Amino acid sequence: MSGAASSVPRICVLFALPEEAAPFLRRQAAVPALGRCTVVVSGAGANKAARATAKLLADGPIECLIVCGFGGGLTEQITPGSLIVAERVLDATGENAETPKICRPDRAMLERAQGPRGDLVTVGKVLTTPGEKQALHARTQAQMVDMETAGAVAVAEQAGVPWLSVRAATDSVDEPLPFDFNALADAEGNIDRGRVVMAALTHPWKIPALIRLGSHSALAAKNLTRFLEACLQQWPD
């Protein structure tokens, strides 16, 4: 993102991770509808997403904000690669953990985004076991979980910026993650690749599950870009 302030309202697309954004960025040069978007990779977690959104606002007017990336499935209907367009975002981070705060996207943006809808809940850590995911669904009835959306959209709402959230699943509700990625994060909360490699080397029987998660993540990123491309090509100029 350029450091110079813009006077032209921008369509801003916020990802958390480089892996989420990579297919979108590769398509930007070839697809004018994507080329007009300002893309930001915030880093993992609601606080980083909130700070990145505040920085976008400081850089100039925003026409709309699309918060997107990976999520975890909380129901049997959500399989790796599945998408949801969030009808509601439940903030279950920090003090809202027991009584989530509810945010709703811009109605016009939601209507333009032709895709499967559902509720998305934002939490403060990676859910690594089926039990954790099942318990969160029982408490919130959400279809998918992430770690960023609530932070970004809270800032957007305060500024009066219309927003939309789209998530693609990397894991199903009954699928445990190969490692506790919370324990493999660095001081900034981002997954440390070196720690992941060491964990794989010391737990080689988990390598197939790690490879499978990588394949699911690649599928989710591809499906997410395909959806965003179709959606943004119909966006009004």
Write out the residue ranges for each language-model feature.
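Protease-domain processing segments flanking chymotrypsin-fold serine proteases, especially trypsin-like
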Residues: M1-G3, L14
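Absolute N-terminal positional cue centered near the fourth residue
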Residues: A4-A5, A92
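Extreme N-terminal starter segment of soluble prokaryotic enzymes
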Residues: S6-C12
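Conserved beta-strand elements of the Class I
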Residues: C12-L14, I66
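Short hydrophobic segments within beta-strands
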Residues: L14-A16, V40
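Helix N-cap/beta->alpha junction signal
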Residues: L17-P18, T149
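Short, charged/polar "capping" segments at the starts of alpha-helices
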Residues: E20-P23
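Glycine-rich phosphate- or other oxyanion-binding loops that anchor nucleotides, phosphorylated ligands
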Residues: R26-D237
